[in-house]
Swiss-Prot record:
GO terms for cellular component: plasma membrane. PROSITE patterns: 4FE4S_FER_1, 4FE4S_FER_2. InterPro entries: 4Fe4S_Fe-S-bd, 4Fe4S_Fe_S_CS, NADH_quinone_OxRdtase_chainI. The lineage of its organism: Bacteria, Pseudomonadati, Acidobacteriota, Terriglobia, Terriglobales. GO terms for molecular function: 4 iron, 4 sulfur cluster binding; iron ion binding; NADH:ubiquinone reductase (non-electrogenic) activity; quinone binding. It catalyses: a quinone + NADH + 5 H(+)(in) = a quinol + NAD(+) + 4 H(+)(out). Residues 53-83, 94-123 form the 4Fe-4S ferredoxin-type domain. This is NADH-quinone oxidoreductase subunit I 1. Its cofactor is [4Fe-4S] cluster. The keyword Glycoprotein does not apply. Binds 2 [4Fe-4S] clusters per subunit. It comes from Koribacter versatilis (strain Ellin345). It is an enzyme of class 7 (translocase).
């Protein structure tokens, strides 16, 4: 019997070699984890997040009540009601309800809007305690802003 295999078993040389390779990968040189919420990820312009409605220079909504966004939505999440203004004879949006709870953020409603009033913004923090909070009306959509920075 040879002494070399016996020494390998006694001093566990193969085990030590394997563990050295394992521990080399356990302590990476650069950390890939984002320290959220202290460090926010960089959001690109093409990101589709929280829906919002743009307002014009005069502070009124740009929506003309055409209902194209509701027709384009594959999940039927948008409910809109519009009436004709008796003075100007133009369609005016009366109610607008957007249910974000089932939205898949496909952007079809944004593409269908002829006035570009509906926009899927860069907000991604939409966690709530109830489903009722996910149903957004016109006032909430018009007054959406950029996400607030984290403070400890």
């Amino acid at each position: 019997m040879s002494i070399a295999p016996l020494l390998r078993k006694v001093f566990l040389i193969d085990l030590i070699k394997g563990l050295s390779i394992t521990f080399k990968y356990q302590a990476p040189k650069d950390c890939q984890t984002e320290q959220y919420p202290q460090e926010r990820p960089v959001i690109t312009d093409r990101f589709r997040g929280q829906p919002m409605m743009k307002l014009g220079e005069n502070g009124e909504t740009l929506c003309i009540g055409c209902n194209l966004c509701a027709l384009a939505c594959p999940e039927n999440l948008i409910a809109m009601k519009s009436d004709r203004d008796p003075v100007t004879k133009k369609k005016v949006m009366v109610t607008y309800v957007y249910d974000v709870s089932r939205c898949m953020f496909c952007g079809l409603c944004e593409e269908a809007c002829p006035t570009q009033s509906l926009k899927l913004g860069t907000g991604y923090e939409m966690a709530l305690y109830s489903r009722e909070g996910m149903v957004l009306d016109r006032k909430v959509l018009e007054h959406r802003t950029a996400p607030e920075p984290y403070e400890k």
